[in-house]
Amino acid sequence: MAEQYIYVMKDLRKIYPPNREVLKGIWLSFFPGAKIGVLGLDGAGRSTLLKIMAGEVTEFGGEAWAAKGAKVGYLAQEPRLDPSKDVLGNVEEGVAETRALLTRFDEINAKFGEPMSEEEMDKVMAEQGRVQDAIDAVNAWEIDRTLEIAMDALRLPPPDADVSRLSGGEKRRVALCRLLLQKPDLLLLDEPTNHLDAESVAWLEHHLQDYPGTVVAITHDRYFLDNVAQWILELDRGRGFPFEGN
């Protein structure tokens, strides 16, 4: 992903029936690694904007697209969890790709105990090197510790808890934990501090300050904005007004 912008909007418009225009010709480009807080009154189109960026809303005017190859992650107001899995099972979805790398590395190592030609050996060693590099790039050897820290910091329910019995706030914390572990290039957060205690908010702020990707967060939390956002995007009467934060 070598594009200048991670997300681009050109003349973005959205109308809800019968004739409520919430976004009126927005032109914006988002830099990789930027931390952006989205402000606006209720009904200003903040959630709609994030849903368009997340691909949840696909009917709109104008153009909007993410950079080629960019991974986009979205925390909705009412996120979806897999009811067939417990808390840990849902959180583990966030590290599925990392787990797959570790599994593949073990499979490759097992091959070295099998008879093979010199050519086959070269291929196996080359793949081992590629997988090793991918593992090192995401610090996969520490995945269990990383997962434990995130679950503890966000005060998640017990790992074996039935997600269908969780409160709305508990479900949001599980979904947020899963999303952060996925490490998307573009992280879209709709009121991420809702249902978090002060210590969890402080951990989240620190995590997002160091987050390598782009963060776009809707929030009413002024302290969160001060501590995380480099830019503010204010939505007012369908228009978007970006300005530099603290």
State where each predicted segment sits.
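ABC ATP-binding cassette signature C-motif
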Residues: M1-N246
